[in-house]
Amino acid sequence: RSTLFPYTTLFRSTLMPCCPAVIDLWCEKPVTFPVISETRNNLSTAFLIRDNLVKLISDQGLSVEQALLDGLYILLELYKNQPITNAHIQEYFSGHTLNKLNTAMEDIHIPDEDTFIECNELLQDLSVNYRKEGLYTAFLQPVLTEACKYSNIYSQSDDNSMSRTLQTSQKQFCSMLTDYDIVFRNYLANELFSDLISPEAASTKKIIEHMIIKMQWIMIEYTAIRQSLFLWYSHNANSPLTYETIREHIVIISRMTGYDDDDIREYLENSFAKLIWDWGYAALIMGIRK
């Protein structure tokens, strides 16, 4: 299934990840997107930023989490340092700048359990209304049961053995997740291409603000998918992850997070201290491992 988004002079068609057949298209080779020529200066800038972000998520030399964190950091810097030019954008996305950024990230340590607890809470919060309405029950029930189990364990125990057990289980899970790396990269590249640009945003500052908000939402989507998959894996006695399981989680979480722009903005304003996060919060939910 595809959806059309109008611009003043063009239409763009994108595939929707809430359809299983679309995910099937993404499991073999990198997805490609049309090159769009735009003469209006503010949208030309937006297209350049978006193209670089898509290129970043497609770079297999970076983990998915690292690419998302790099992308958000650059967007936040561009937002703070107005006005910007195409030369500024190219400099931020240059190999030299990215190497410095990723080297700096190596000195950051966020405990795995802190990331796990926050991701658990994010997934539970996203699921509240669907549970009330009795939607996606067969999918959510085992996942959220497992989430509650871990929440209770962490609230009642300071035992380091729990942390070690979680780390071992997560290491095994992450190893299996890498088998489907191309699916996640294609999913995220499509989200970036289809969602980052708003034709309604009049100024460059507003365009970049919109990009930051949508990037945060994409990070929430990815976090929810990854967390739900880990909880499924834990609930099913560490059973191997299959492609069908990966696809189901991407499809259902995509349906659950398919909010329009106003609803996304409202959700972020109601759920977080600030509409635009500090970069450190993104690092918390993505996880930074040495």
Task: Place the predicted regions along the sequence by residue.
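Single conserved hydrophobic/aromatic residue that forms the stacking wall/gate
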Residues: 1-9
